Regions:
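Beta-strand-rich extracellular passenger or scaffold domains
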Residues: 132, 205-207, 224-227, 283
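Bacterial N-terminal signal peptides
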Residues: 7-16
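Pocket-lining segment of extracytoplasmic ligand-binding domains
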Residues: 185, 203
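Positively charged n-region of N-terminal signal peptides that target proteins for export
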Residues: 1-7
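Acidic, glycine-rich calcium-binding repeat modules characteristic of RTX/beta-roll
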Residues: 214-216, 223
Length: 284
């Protein structure tokens, strides 16, 4: 009976552990005088970046507990959360702005960021497990997250997107080579003009654009949809157990069957190689 009472007391004690420490916010505005080099990172928080004035970087942040549901990890104190909000991890050296990164007091704490920056800023944004959203900012952008989603529009020039298991959606403004990779999510890319390497372990891929150099699209078990418009390119498509469908006129090359098609479309051009292990391929 005594052991049962002790066990019940232990369960009650665990149940009454607060789920959240308090939250605290901060706001900063940094003045810049030229092309900004912007680096943003957070352990498990979200990052949201939008286009702002050309001469400043405006930062709003929310500091909060991370590691929810992990009873053995003590919650950070309200005092520590407030201390980080009072002195957030922001560094500026001229037009180089670094937000997040290493901070000795960030154990069990995450920070969500909402940032306004000049549209032509060089951008490097990374989250350990949160979502990253970018709207109208980023020259030669590099965006990554461990397990969150990436949603980026208005990216200038080439860009590189990488997530461990989330979905990727991106729209390009201008021309440049693109690389987009996810371990198990879906990939959707629009308005591409340049080279492309897009891949996912088991999700679907949907792409619209005009190849100016070779493209490669690959998934382990999903479907792939490519909208080419009036682009001229050479198609090399293969699937392990799905079908290949196109409504475009094509001058075939070599042998073709239900699982492999190769040929020139609109006279040929850069090679678009499309591969899936077990999904369908559509080109239109």
């Amino acid at each position: 009976m005594k052991h049962l009472l002790l066990a019940a007391a232990a369960v009650l004690a665990l149940a009454t552990v607060p789920a959240l420490a308090s939250e605290a916010t901060f706001e900063r505005t940094l003045s810049v005088s030229g092309r900004v080099e912007l680096s943003v990172s957070t352990g498990s928080g979200n990052i949201h970046i939008t286009r702002g004035a050309g001469n400043q970087v405006h930062i709003w942040g929310k500091v909060k507990q991370s590691g929810f549901g992990k009873i053995l990890i003590p919650a950070p104190s309200d005092e520590r959360i407030r201390a980080i909000a009072a002195n957030p991890p922001i560094e500026q050296t001229g037009n180089i702005v670094r937000i997040g990164g290493h901070h000795e007091n960030l154990h069990n704490i995450s920070i969500d960021y909402e940032i306004q920056a000049p549209e032509d800023a060089f951008l490097d944004a990374a989250s350990g497990s949160g979502d990253v959203t970018v709207d109208g900012v980023g020259e030669n952008a590099k965006i990554s997250t461990g397990s969150g989603n990436i949603h980026a529009t208005g990216l200038h020039g080439g860009f590189k997107l990488d997530t461990g298991s989330g979905n990727i959606y991106a729209e390009q403004a201008g021309q440049g080579d693109v690389k987009a990779q996810t371990g198990s999510g879906n990939v959707e890319l629009r308005n591409l003009h340049g080279g492309l390497h897009g891949g996912t372990g088991s999700g679907n891929i949907k792409v619209a654009g005009t190849p100016s150099t070779d493209w490669k699209l690959e998934t382990g078990s999903g479907n792939i949809d490519f909208t080419a418009g009036g682009a001229a390119f050479t198609l090399d498509a293969s699937t392990g157990s799905g079908g290949i469908h196109t409504d475009m006129e094509m001058l075939t090359q070599g042998s073709t069957d239900h699982h492999h098609v190769s040929g020139k479309i609109n006279g040929g051009g850069p090679t678009v190689r499309i591969e899936t292990g077990s999904g369908d391929i559509r080109v239109h």
